[in-house]
Regions:
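N-terminal anchoring/stem segment of glycosyltransferases
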Residues: 1-58
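Short aromatic/hydrophobic "clamp" motif used to bind/position activated sugar donors
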Residues: 62
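Short loop/turn segments at strand-loop or loop-helix junctions that form parts
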Residues: 5-12, 39-41, 67-68, 96-99, ...
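Acidic/proline-rich low-complexity IDRs
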Residues: 31, 81, 91, 101, ...
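A short acidic (Asp/Glu
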Residues: 16-17, 47-49, 73-77, 105-106, ...
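C-terminal catalytic/acceptor-binding lobe
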Residues: 3-11, 16-18, 25, 131-205
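Conserved catalytic core of nucleotide-sugar-dependent glycosyltransferases
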Residues: 55, 69-150
């Protein structure tokens, strides 16, 4: 059972600061044993577009992540063990909350039920093509969580207390393009929203 990574490479205007942050994560991720490392650099991707691409890998573990996220070998090993031992793999989905990374001595769990930068599937799922959900926009994770939990009836967990991936965004709010000068959100993904509460790997049944 292979593990694949799907991510974008996007910023609304040319921004060398964001590009450097994305590059930092890319250099980390490319050293890992991903079977496929798929990067959409044509536009801001949607969950729909990634899930369509993931249909090429129906027997693999497929990770959708933002470009400022990176992983390590322990994450991949723990993830592989989880799916190997889970009976109904197609029903298991993970929506993970980030660990903010500045350096090896400064890593903090964001500990939020309403924020997931990473979603993981065995194979893929079908979303309504009439509703395109963009990555990296406020509420995109909560909207996707609602569809997965309420419409598709998947078993969705957030074991980010144990399963740690890292978010590298030291530039913070200064490069968030959905904020105005007062640091207020100027957009949000509409529709029903759900939160995914934090848990440990041992809580997944």
């Amino acid at each position: 059972m292979n593990i694949n990574l799907f991510t974008g490479w996007f910023y609304d205007t040319k921004n060398i600061i964001r590009e450097n942050e994305f590059n930092f994560c890319y250099e980390k991720n490319k050293k890992l044993n991903f079977n496929q490392y798929y990067i959409d650099n044509t536009k801001r991707p949607t969950y729909n577009s990634f899930l369509n691409e993931m249909k090429k890998y129906p027997n693999d573990i497929n990770i959708i992540a933002n470009p400022d996220n990176f992983f390590d070998d322990k994450f991949l090993n723990d993830l592989h063990n989880l799916y190997t031992n889970y009976k109904d793999k197609e029903k298991l989905c993970l929506g993970l909350t980030r660990w903010d990374y500045l350096n090896e001595n400064d890593i903090k769990h964001f500990r939020a039920k309403d924020s997931q930068d990473v979603f993981i599937f065995y194979g893929s799922v079908d979303l309504n093509t009439e509703e395109q959900i963009p990555l990296g926009r406020p509420g995109c994770d909560n909207r996707l969580a609602s569809i997965l939990m309420c419409d598709l009836k998947l078993n969705v967990f957030n074991p980010s207390m144990d399963l740690k991936y890292y978010h590298y965004h030291p530039s913070g709010d200064s490069t968030r393009t959905y904020l105005n000068e007062k640091l207020e959100r100027t957009e949000v993904v509409m529709g029903a929203h759900e939160f995914i509460h934090l848990c440990s790997l041992n809580d997944i049944k």
